[in-house]
């Protein structure tokens, strides 16, 4: 064995990628789980598997020049990290957000490798995106950027090579712009992107898949203690696709979601978020791109500015916003208030200390790699539908 201890290996990762703290955290989480197996397996040691799984197959970085509505040219960075294709083509989302950098995308791509393998589908892992911020941009500006982004990305993707999808800042609209440009360049209609609209090759239930899958996962977790989700109070962070559709499925199954959040703060609706209110949130976020505080004004509920919802008493907590949104203090507050189920709708939303606290308290904890894999599972179904040209019904996909 090249490394004498787990600490020595993790220290080598930090030394090699000193500025990529999110990547360090993702690697540490996985290594804690597999160290004994990897360190005591002669074949794994001989072929240095540990070093190999933390280094991507390739990292692609490119310039993305685009034009705004005033004919000014802007330049952003584009990335695609093709991390591992041991069991299938690279698969993972594209994120458009000003926080995007190499460290964040490496952590997301690394997580994606294991998440995809847990679905049982033959998919490798990758991730990509740009530091472009779609907020406040017109449709024409977003289209200009997406065309420019695909003008370079098309060289590196394909239905048997790498199949990107959406993520933060990349919904059906952005996927549509990129898919149209890819189709124009290649003169071929192939399943090279997932998350497409249902009128042009997308799958029913794809927008809902991660949120629905998260709740189904919670239901199965609770069965291990012979508990039902019906009547349980649930705190949810975020207000994007995952949070919206998690709430939708919670309502359908008889649970009571009471919070939603965004980067400005959170709302607390103690009477419960209803389907009518979720429809309002969908329009609020996807059409108006407005803040969740508008919900508080419309429904006369409490809005807590600059805070996260983990102080609210609940049975179940679903962090669905972003990485490291739930720290040790939040974890202690949750368990102190009686929360006994935490399932991650976002990627690595809990800090390492928070995860250790959940495990030590013996609550039901569902890590994101498993709990939010519903999205990539339905992406696999979309890929299959694109290959066979046979669409599936909503009931078939949700079943």
Give, region by region, the residue ranges found by the protein language model.
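Adenosine-phosphate binding glycine-rich loop
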Residues: 2-26, 221, 335-399
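Structured beta-strand/loop patches that form or line metal/cofactor-binding pockets in enzymes
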Residues: 43-74
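N-terminal cap/recognition module
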Residues: 72-113
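Glycine/serine-rich phosphate-binding loop and adjoining beta1-alpha1 elements at the start
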Residues: 97, 116-230
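General beta-strand structural signal in soluble alpha/beta enzymes
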Residues: 161-165, 188-193, 236, 259-262, ...
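Glycine-rich phosphate/diphosphate-binding loop of Rossmann-like nucleotide-binding domains
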Residues: 194-197, 202-313
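Rossmann-fold NAD(P) dinucleotide-binding segment
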Residues: 304-314, 324-341
């Amino acid at each position: 064995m090249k490394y004498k201890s787990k600490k020595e290996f993790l220290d080598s990762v930090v030394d090699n990628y000193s500025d990529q703290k999110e990547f360090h955290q993702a690697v540490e989480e996985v290594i804690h789980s597999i160290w004994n197996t990897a360190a005591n397996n002669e074949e794994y040691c001989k072929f240095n598997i540990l070093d190999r799984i933390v280094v991507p197959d390739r990292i692609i970085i490119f310039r993305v020049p685009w034009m705004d509505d005033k004919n000014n040219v802007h330049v952003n960075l584009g990335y695609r990290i093709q991390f591992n294709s041991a069991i299938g083509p690279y698969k993972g989302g594209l994120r458009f957000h000003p926080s995007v950098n190499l460290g964040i995308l490496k952590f997301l791509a690394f997580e994606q490798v294991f998440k995809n393998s847990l679905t049982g589908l033959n998919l490798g892992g990758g991730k990509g995106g740009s530091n472009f911020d779609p907020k406040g941009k017109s449709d024409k500006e977003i289209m200009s950027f997406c065309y420019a982004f695909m003008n370079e990305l098309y060289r590196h993707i394909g239905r048997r090579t790498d199949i990107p999808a959406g993520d933060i800042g990349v919904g059906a609209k952005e996927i549509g712009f990129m898919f149209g440009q890819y189709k124009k360049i290649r003169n071929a209609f192939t399943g090279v992107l997932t998350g497409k609209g249902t009128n042009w090759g997308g799958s029913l239930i794809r927008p809902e898949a991660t949120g629905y899958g998260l709740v189904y996962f919670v239901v199965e977790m609770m069965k291990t203690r012979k508990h039902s989700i019906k009547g349980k109070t649930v705190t949810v962070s975020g207000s994007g696709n995952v949070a919206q559709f998690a709430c939708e499925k919670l309502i359908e199954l008889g649970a009571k979601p009471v919070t939603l959040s965004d980067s400005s703060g959170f709302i607390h609706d103690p009477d419960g978020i209803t389907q009518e209110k979720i429809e309002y949130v969908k329009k609020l976020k996807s059409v108006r791109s407005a803040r969740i505080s508008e919900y508080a004004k419309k429904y006369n509920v409490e809005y807590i500015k600059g805070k996260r919802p983990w102080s609210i008493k609940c049975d179940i907590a679903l962090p669905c916003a972003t990485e490291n949104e739930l720290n040790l203090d939040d974890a202690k507050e949750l368990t102190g208030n009686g929360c006994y189920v935490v399932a991650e709708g976002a990627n690595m939303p809990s800090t390492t200390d928070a995860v250790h606290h959940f495990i030590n308290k013996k609550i039901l904890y569902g890590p994101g790699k498993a709990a939010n894999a519903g999205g990539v599972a339905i992406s696999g179904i979309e890929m299959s539908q694109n290959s066979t040209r046979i669409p599936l019904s909503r009931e078939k996909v949700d079943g």
